[in-house]
């Protein structure tokens, strides 16, 4: 039976206004819209009055429900029938954890009530199309239609293909019907194999073969034999990549054979809880570094949010499934798309060439895709710390003559680093009889065909198969699985995981054969043991679907009880679905039909399938010389600063958590003005050291339109000039991921790909001492469509994205582009040696040209000398700032440095030649260093020692003020105010934020950037930062116990425990399942801290599901109430823990006036480094800090204080319960965005109880308790930041 319950309003006023404006623009006469959430409960038994009241209360969250009956025509938007939304999975979990077992499933829709003039049926269809994502949702005309969401079908049997009766044609028909993308020789191979077996194949076997042997999974082109211009080539592409490892194997521990590569890290104290006692402590051991970079291009073109989200999620799983289990740590994200054409903000170079109906626009991708990628990283609890963004779409004269080149099929890049124990780098042995396990969520009918679909050019497959390729993300489930993996690797030698892979393309049909085959075994499986939420699925759908957040593992049978215990504690679902066998054979039994859908020798599936041969021709690009007749430097500056590739990326940065883990030493945002210009990302290796890891990206794809090899060399060079900003040492410590995107089969592209791989794998990397131990390829970067009567194609440039990874010697020595105005000198290191080529530059692009001669690596020895010189200068602390030269050239390098330093620049470019346009806008390798004036001679001498004398040019200096002046021989070349340039540079991010977020907030942020008087972040302390007030108490040896409380989806508990540990506490890991299961009580604890994260993925209100699981469980409710009433206890709630505790007001004495925390005013997750002041309040944790003003990490989507009315706010203030407020950089309490990131009244961001024993706050002091973890800080701070005082206050209060 289904029950319908109304929910809160679904859209803020500005979202409704945006919808109305879209309808008006489409000439749809819609006058008013009201939208509210509607909940549908699928019940297996009726609820009594108490249970009904509980369910009703559970579904009350967010803004207050409208009391009026909505008017207008109803359009109900729900998930597509036959799918289960991530919201549904999490909400159902909450209901069950609150004891409502009668609820089989909760689902949510949005009821739109539309008041409109008379509309035709077609116009109503247009209205409906604006309200939903056709790939994921459907529209019903009535609420009761939602019953279709809960219809269960009978299981479907396996289907056989009559190969023996119909011959080869049966396979050809199945290939088309199932979208298998099989090549002719593969059809021949299958015909021969099954004829030998003497039986017909089942559809599931063909599908499994197609996924396991797709280009996406098997990388056939990279393993192919090559004939170029009639000459056989000596090596495959992959062999040339492997040559880098054969030449420079140094520091590599694992390459080419696992889900990620591994290199040597540093010996540090890894901080985690003991399995038996729950007590956190440091464990001194090597923290080796793993690295992986994936792409998820096809799904992102079809449905950007889930496409990008599952792209990030899949890469995170690759990291976790490395060796015998590892820990993902920090991420990177990148996008290449066609021109944005922002409505009302179209740029002169952005022609509309049309697109296929089935893919979304570049603007849609960049609106939704980054949000999806960020949301997954945020909810999983991994900071995303670097990235890139390129737009390109133009008709150019390239290798194949004049044609359309661009990214209608986008690049969505997802990568990152992690850590792994030394003894877990290599996978173990799968013993015969080992249990074969699926860890993670249930099978669902989603993502079918992802591997094969990704291997086709967009436009080749059937639209229904595109629907089938759309995936669904549930990062909170993946976090639970990762917690299980963490518990396993933390057991060291007792780790129960023998072997692990992630489930990606092809689902279990790819993952399980790969698992047993890699382990040298076979497998015997039972289909019906696979967890499934949809009983009507066929065997093919159960075995081959790509439900996300799953891993496959081999666990020894005697270790199963331990594994079961770990999974239950973390509430991570798992199923034992088979056993490892001696014989390398794969069998899948189906209990329901008592038949055998799969019965194959593994070598048929994964054996010597036909090897590809690429017989291709070389084409040379001619290009056209740049026509510069109408180009002025002033206009060029304006245009280039508006090119999205160059322009400010704040709209892509602040949506992503950049502080979780407490180990982020360098994020994108630089300096007191938080400008997103960092060259690389840096993390600390642990919470007790200054060793670390660095990541950077290099990518110069448009150059490939003129010179394939040069483009590849520049990508490597740019990654190197970016990562050189931190202290690494030996260049051999740097390891690269190479991600290759090409339109294989397009004239000239295959030979160009070979040239590019050879240039990097056989030449440049070996010469530099660089290794490429990991990478990925995507070989179908083309879209086809009909535009009127014309057949069109959009082909991407050959695109190599290089991600560089390295161990860092001392993270404190990382340089940024932030200029200093002390007596200084700016020096250009020009690795282009005066070539100043303008082909395929940003300058050429904004004037709709390509040019003829591009930049290149001019001298490999000098590139190596540059890196070595930078390392010497970084180690000697001789540099004040560094920024590489890349898109936009020297002009942009200097401008971004001035933006970061909020200062002026006076430079002279006479030494760079007479062609000022080329000097300022060429994109040759190199960059600008800033040195102290007195160090200039010594620095130039050192650069000369490294062979760079002819590359170094003195430019001028940074000055206080607002003028950005470029001269040549004292003649002005360009002069403008830095503020004007900053505003131009920011306009793209402003317009994107206006479109995507609350436009009022976007306007306020843009206005703030234009304020030259802004002093930037600053610090005022009312206490001595160097005083350790906890030291006398630590000296007694007594360590009070703090319960570090987490719920499923939590993610800030480790750094929280470390902060309390440093202050003299014994931090104990306490999961809510421990309390609900009665394994642990709160009676033995002196302090309680509820940590941040996304409990239940913020479903049913941030923190509210967590709170209600306490309030609706009588025994646990009593535990908390007793704790809060006990004298001599302390409690802290941070972020998600703050939201949770604010919903426990009925249990906490003196908290009656506390507010609720609701959706940010921007309607967006906000990750900021915000200035707060400590106000006078009873809070025991903030004693002695009153009046202090300092920045703190902020990461939340629902942090806005909501009070009932003005009287409630006045009472909260008059009682003095406000503990922290947001202030602007002038020290004034603010409600203005982004200084106040959520719009809370009076800047309120922390409150306390009347006795001060319980304090709750939205910002994260635990993430910045170490100075090194602050995005910016005064140079005189030591190891501890001022926020460490909170934790020491806690220790002092407990005596």
Swiss-Prot record:
Positions annotated to bind Mg(2+): 679, 718, 722, 884
Domain of life according to the entry: Bacteria
Entry-linked Gene3D superfamilies: 3.40.50.880, Phosphoribosylformylglycinamidine synthase, linker domain, PurM-like C-terminal domain, PurM-like, N-terminal domain
CDD domains noted in UniProt: GATase1_FGAR_AT (cd01740), PurL (cd02193), PurL_repeat1 (cd02203)
Binding site for ATP: 307-318, 386-388, 678, 886
PROSITE patterns per UniProt: GATASE_TYPE_1 (PS51273)
Record keyword ATP-binding present: yes
Region annotated Disordered, chain positions: 305-327
Protein name stated in the entry: Phosphoribosylformylglycinamidine synthase
Record's keyword annotation contains Protein biosynthesis: no
Subcellular location, record wording: Cytoplasm
Source organism (scientific name): Salmonella choleraesuis (strain SC-B67)
One protein family per Pfam: AIRS_C
Main localisation: cytoplasm
Keywords: ATP-binding, Cytoplasm, Glutamine amidotransferase, Ligase, Magnesium, Metal-binding, Nucleotide-binding, Purine biosynthesis
Name of encoding gene: purL
EC number: 6.3.5.3
Leading EC class: ligase
């Amino acid at each position: 039976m289904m029950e319908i319950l109304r929910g809160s309003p679904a859209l803020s006023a500005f979202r409704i206004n945006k919808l109305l404006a879209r309808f008006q623009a489409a000439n749809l006469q819609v006058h008013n819209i009201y939208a509210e959430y509607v909940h549908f409960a699928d019940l297996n038994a009726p609820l009594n009055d108490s249970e009904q009241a509980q369910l009703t209360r559970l579904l009350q969250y967010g803004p207050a429900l409208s009391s009026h009956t909505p008017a207008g025509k109803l359009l109900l938007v729900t998930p597509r029938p036959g799918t289960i939304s991530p919201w549904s999975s999490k909400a159902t979990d909450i209901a069950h954890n609150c004891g409502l077992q009668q609820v089989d499933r909760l689902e949510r829709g949005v009821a739109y009530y539309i008041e409109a003039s008379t509309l035709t049926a077609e116009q109503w269809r247009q209205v409906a199309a604006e309200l939903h994502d056709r790939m994921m949702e459907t529209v019903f005309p009535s609420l009761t239609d939602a019953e279709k969401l809960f219809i269960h079908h009978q299981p479907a049997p396996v289907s056989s293909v009559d190969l023996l009766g119909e011959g080869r044609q049966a396979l050809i028909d199945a290939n088309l019907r199932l979208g298998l993308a099989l090549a002719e020789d593969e059809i021949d191979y299958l015909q021969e194999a099954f004829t030998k077996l003497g039986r017909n194949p089942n559809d599931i076997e063909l599908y499994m073969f197609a996924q396991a042997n797709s280009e996406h999974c098997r990388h056939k082109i990279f393993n192919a034999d090559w004939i170029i211009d009639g000459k056989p080539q000596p090596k495959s592409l992959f062999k040339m990549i492997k040559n880098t490892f054969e030449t420079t194997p140094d520091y590599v521990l694992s390459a080419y054979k696992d889900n990620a590569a591994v290199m040597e890290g540093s010996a540090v104290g890894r901080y985690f809880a003991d399995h038996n006692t729950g007590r956190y402590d440091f464990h001194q051991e090597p923290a080796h570094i793993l690295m992986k970079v994936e792409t998820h291009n096809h799904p992102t073109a079809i449905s950007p949010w889930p496409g990008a989200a599952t792209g990030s999620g899949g890469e995170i799983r690759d990291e976790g499934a490395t060796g015998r289990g590892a820990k993902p740590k920090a991420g990177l994200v990148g996008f290449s798309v066609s021109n944005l054409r922002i409505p009302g903000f179209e740029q002169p170079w952005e022609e509309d060439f049309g697109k296929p109906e089935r893919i979304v626009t570049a603007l849609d991708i960049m609106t939704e895709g980054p949000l999806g990628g960020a949301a997954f990283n945020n909810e999983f609890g991994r900071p995303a710390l670097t990235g890139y963004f390129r737009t390109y779409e133009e008709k150019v004269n390239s290798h194949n003559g004049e044609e359309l080149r661009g990214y209608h099929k986008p690049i969505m890049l997802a990568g990152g680093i992690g850590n792994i124990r030394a003894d877990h780098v290599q996978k173990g042995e799968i013993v015969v009889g080992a249990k074969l396990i699926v860890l993670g969520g249930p099978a669902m009918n989603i993502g079918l065909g992802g591997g094969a679909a990704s291997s086709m050019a967009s436009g080749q497959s059937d639209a229904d198969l595109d629907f089938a390729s759309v995936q669904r993300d549930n990062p909170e489930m993946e976090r639970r699985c990762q917690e299980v993996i963490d518990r396993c690797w933390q057991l060291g030698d007792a780790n129960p995981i023998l072997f692990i892979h992630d489930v990606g393309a092809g689902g279990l049909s790819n993952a399980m054969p790969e698992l047993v085959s890699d382990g040298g075994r076979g497998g015997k499986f039972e289909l019906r043991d696979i967890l499934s939420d949809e009983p009507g699925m066929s065997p093919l759908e159960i075995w081959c679907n790509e439900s996300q957040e799953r891993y496959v593992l081999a666990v020894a049978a005697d270790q199963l009880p331990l594994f079961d215990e770990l999974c239950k504690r973390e509430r991570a679902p798992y199923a034992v679905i088979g056993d490892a066998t001696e014989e390398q054979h794969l069998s899948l039994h189906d209990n329901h039909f008592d038949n055998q859908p799969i019965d194959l020798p593994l070598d048929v599936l994964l054996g010597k399938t036909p090897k590809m041969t690429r017989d291709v021709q070389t084409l040379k690009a001619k290009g056209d010389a740049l026509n510069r007749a109408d180009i002025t430097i002033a206009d060029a500056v304006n245009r280039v600063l508006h090119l999205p590739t160059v322009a400010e990326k704040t709209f892509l940065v602040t949506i992503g958590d950049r502080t979780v883990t407490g180990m982020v030493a360098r994020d994108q945002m630089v300096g007191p003005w938080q400008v997103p210009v960092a060259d690389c990302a840096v993390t600390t290796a642990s919470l007790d050291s200054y060793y670390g890891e660095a990541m950077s990206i290099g990518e110069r794809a448009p150059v490939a339109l003129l010179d394939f090899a040069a483009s590849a060399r520049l990508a490597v060079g740019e990654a190197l000039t970016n990562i050189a900003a931190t202290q690494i040492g030996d260049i051999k410590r740097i390891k690269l991921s190479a991600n290759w995107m090409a339109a294989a089969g397009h004239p000239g592209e295959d030979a160009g790909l070979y040239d590019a791989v050879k240039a990097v794998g056989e030449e440049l990397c070996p010469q530099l001492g660089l290794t490429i131990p990991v990478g990925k390829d995507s070989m179908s970067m083309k879209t086809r469509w009909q535009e009127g009567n014309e057949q069109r194609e959009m082909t991407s440039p050959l695109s190599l994205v290089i991600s560089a990874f390295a161990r860092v010697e001392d993270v404190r020595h990382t340089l940024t582009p932030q200029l200093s105005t002390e007596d200084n000198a700016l020096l250009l290191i020009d690795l282009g040696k005066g070539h100043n080529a303008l082909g395929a530059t940003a300058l050429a692009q904004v004037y709709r040209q390509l040019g003829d001669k591009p930049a290149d690596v001019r001298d490999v020895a000098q590139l190596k000398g540059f890196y070595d010189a930078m390392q010497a200068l970084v180690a000697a602390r001789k540099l004040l700032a560094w920024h590489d030269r890349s898109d936009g050239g020297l002009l942009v390098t200097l401008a971004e440095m001035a933006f970061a330093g909020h200062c002026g620049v006076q430079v002279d470019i006479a030494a760079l030649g007479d062609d000022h346009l080329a000097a300022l806008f060429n994109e040759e390798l190199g960059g600008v260093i800033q040195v102290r004036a007195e160090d200039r001679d010594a620095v130039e001498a050192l650069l000369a020692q490294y062979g760079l004398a002819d590359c170094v040019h003195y430019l001028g200096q940074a000055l206080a003020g607002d003028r950005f002046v470029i001269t040549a021989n004292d003649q002005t070349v360009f002069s403008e105010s830095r503020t004007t340039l900053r505003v131009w540079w920011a306009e793209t991010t402003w317009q994107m934020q206006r479109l995507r977020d609350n436009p009022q907030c976007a306007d306020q942020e843009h206005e703030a950037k234009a304020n030259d008087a802004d002093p930037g972040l600053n610090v005022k302390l009312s206490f001595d930062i160097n005083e350790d007030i906890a030291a006398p108490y630590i000296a007694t040896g007594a360590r009070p116990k703090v319960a570090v409380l987490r719920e499923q989806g939590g993610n800030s508990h480790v750094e929280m425990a470390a902060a309390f540990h440093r202050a003299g506490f014994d931090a104990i890991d306490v999961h809510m399942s421990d309390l609900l299961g009665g394994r642990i009580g709160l009676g033995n604890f002196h302090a309680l801290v509820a940590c941040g994260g996304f409990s239940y993925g913020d479903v049913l209100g941030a923190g509210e599901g967590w709170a209600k699981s306490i309030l609706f469980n009588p025994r646990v409710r009593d535990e908390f109430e007793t704790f809060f009433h006990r004298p001599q206890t302390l409690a802290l709630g941070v972020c998600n823990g703050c939201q949770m505790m604010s919903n426990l007001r009925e249990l906490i004495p003196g908290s009656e006036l506390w507010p609720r925390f609701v959706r940010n005013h921007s309607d967006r997750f906000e990750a900021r480094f915000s200035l707060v002041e400590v106000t006078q309040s009873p809070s025991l944790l903030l004693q002695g800090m009153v009046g202090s003003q300092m920045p703190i990490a902020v990461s939340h989507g629902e942090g806005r204080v909501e009070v009932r009315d003005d009287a409630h706010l006045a009472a909260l203030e008059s009682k003095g319960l406000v503990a922290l407020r947001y202030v602007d950089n002038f020290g004034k309490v603010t409600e203005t965005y982004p200084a106040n990131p959520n719009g809370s009244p009076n800047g309120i961001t922390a409150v306390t109880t009347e006795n001060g024993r319980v304090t709750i706050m939205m910002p994260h002091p635990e993430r910045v308790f170490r100075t090194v973890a602050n995005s910016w800080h005064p140079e005189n701070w030591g190891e501890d930041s001022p926020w460490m005082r909170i934790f020491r206050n806690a220790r002092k209060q407990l005596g």
